């Protein structure tokens, strides 16, 4: 839903009260054409080889997504990640601190992550002229986009944040249930997990009717 609202407001230009706004050459009054480099900084990740990782609570991110965990976060809070090598232009939004390795950039910006996430995903970062595929920062910074007014960005970010919070909650619940299954199923199969004393209630459709004798 958050992506569809982004497209509706900032691509199709059907944002709230758009019918009352004057458009000049396709740009709404009060909006600005900006270079990406004017609103954010792409910062290099840091090499972290497998042998140097200490398993922990923080995800390690490469351009293909999560590639492991570590006990320390290079970036202490939520932020955005952009693929630099390999899966060029991939965009991730971790739900906690994280460790970006040297195949990605992490983003610094004053704009809300909820808005930037879909803005970055809409960008074409592929450089077809490069001998080795990769995302050049200067090339990325030169991408043009139309920057909405701050109140509209804030309004959208509130919508996006709430949608992502629901998604993150469901993801954490699924991870918890999966860990419980992986922990308890082998014990159940081997007979080490006693179920005889559990108060298991079956639905009526699963209960066989009692036979009269």
Residue ranges: model-predicted function:
Residues 25-148, 196-213:
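DNA target-recognition domains and sequence-specific DNA-contacting regions of bacterial/archaeal
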Residues 100, 154-155:
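Short small-residue beta-strand/loop micro-motif enriched in glycine and branched aliphatics
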Residues 1-8, 12, 16-62, 150-154, ...:
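Non-catalytic DNA-recognition/assembly elements of restriction-modification systems
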Residues 104-106, 156, 166:
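Short histidine-centered catalytic/ligand-binding loop motif
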